[in-house]
Amino acid sequence: MFFTPGRGSRSPTNAVITPRFELNSSGSISPPLVVSGLGVRADGPTQAPSLPLTTGANNPNPNPKARDNPSESAATPTPPRPVVLVEMGAPTYRLAAAVTGPSGAEAGFLVARQPPPPRVQEEEGEYGRFVDSDLYDLPSAPLRRLAQGEQARPGVAVADAEAEGPLDLSRLDVPAALDQILSQLGLTNAMCGEWRLLKHIEEPEFGPDAGVNTVLVITSLESKPEALQDSCKWMSTEGARELLSDVKPGDTRIGPYVHVGFVKSDLSSDCTAGSTLVSQEYPPGITLVPMKSSTLRPFRTTNLVVIQATSGTCGSKRPDYFACGDVLLIDPGCCSQVHTELADLVNSLPKKLLVLVTHHHNDHVEGLSVVQRCNPDAVLLTHENTMKRIGKGNWSTGYTAVTGGESICIGDQELQVVFAPGHTDGHMGLLHVNTNALIVGDHCVGHGSAILDNRAGGNMKDYFQTTYKFLEMSPHVLIPMHGRINLWPKHMLCGYLKNRKAREASILQSIENGAQTLFDIVSKTYCDVDRKLWIPASFNVRLHVDHLNSQHKLPKDFSLEMFSGSCDEFMSSLQQ
């Protein structure tokens, strides 16, 4: 679930849940040889929606352009680690509404088509064919916190609005938010019965901001309206369940509010029940548990992904399945401070356990030893290039090598391993076939773009090819290991391509204008970027120069030997 298990009632009419945000220290954790995902605070109108608060395009969320400029969301995973501080602050709120037929949910509920992120003119060319399918979800609107002494205007009342506790609806402008929601549906409040508080959904600490908590309310119409807005339609619980759990590329998609409001309790259990961890399940069968890790600011956590059967356990192994289990863990990379919590989680899981590591960076493997200690029979799956870089202290026994294309069975869940080089030469992704959700490791991050590890086979040509491969797979959801999931995957991936191509063009221009050394290129290409970010930016610059050379685009008077020699001098030049 999105809220903290064991911290408040789960009953439909009592949703007083204690918000928990464990703030990490403001210092940057910097293992000197670890590269991981980073996003820098993004401010701008073109930001791709993410879960759980933002399924529409007009909400604050990660920037799909993923520019290297901090003002446009530059992502930088890598050593050494510059400090980019983003204050957590207090969570904001959003109101989502479940509007059912006159006889309740049995008569169906209303969903609204979510507006996609705005497309710019250049997307109609090369990227015009990559369009995300329609996404329907419960209607929602921002829920403003009232100022001190301010009273909400008279109007719509919600049962339990005066409830004592951390969630006090009397301090939130519920009437204004409900007005926005009803206008999306083409309804008026006079057509609705009593509004009741259904759930308070607490967003886990994905970062870099404090997140958005959601208040879910429910009402029944007095009678079904004769006409609805064109963007709205009736949905049954059974229909939503089918669209969520038996997905084909290009199908109509169902968003997270429908899942948590009407479907989730019927499909699966919470793997973090009874613990202090806050998790999020969406799509069905995929649970994200952000856990404190040694990743680079502004992120503080790495998403541990837990995939469990939604019904039954693993049966006999089919010939076409490479591996079978009752549960799959992906990237247990939490730091030692939360190894006790990781151990508790692993001990609560079925013993037929598979573990997949997308790549070798410390913030993705630091918890492997805990998993092995708790379950010595667990099977580790990873690429051979990754295993060569994982220390014996993390995993002391054998492993099963994967190269891409392997099928994995987790009870009633099917997954396909995807070879996804670029970030490193052994980087892997994973497609959750049931929901068409793509787990992308550090190829993408929930906020910003990715830096490639040039010391571990990172390669710009591979990165471009993997991005196009992901686009052709037509995923419905992107799940990164840092930050929130992205509900507009094609839009996000196209943004990554545009960003990298634009950056490569600017690097080539600086070389054509006389830049010869790494410092020359970085200082010209990133002149409007904080110098603290030049170090991580330099890793991608090296790989862009290699990519330009492989395409025979570098000027004849550009000396690769001089450029390579200047890479060792970059740090001293930066400090001058």
Model-flagged regions — what are they?
Residues 136-139, 322-329, 334-336, 414-509:
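Metallo-beta-lactamase
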Residues 198-239, 252, 257-260:
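Active-site-adjacent beta-strand/loop module that shapes the phosphate/pyrophosphate-binding cleft
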Residues 271-348, 429-441:
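Conserved beta-strand hairpin/beta-sheet module of binuclear metal-dependent hydrolase folds
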Residues 300, 334-411:
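Active-site HxH/HxHxD metal-binding segment of metal-dependent hydrolases
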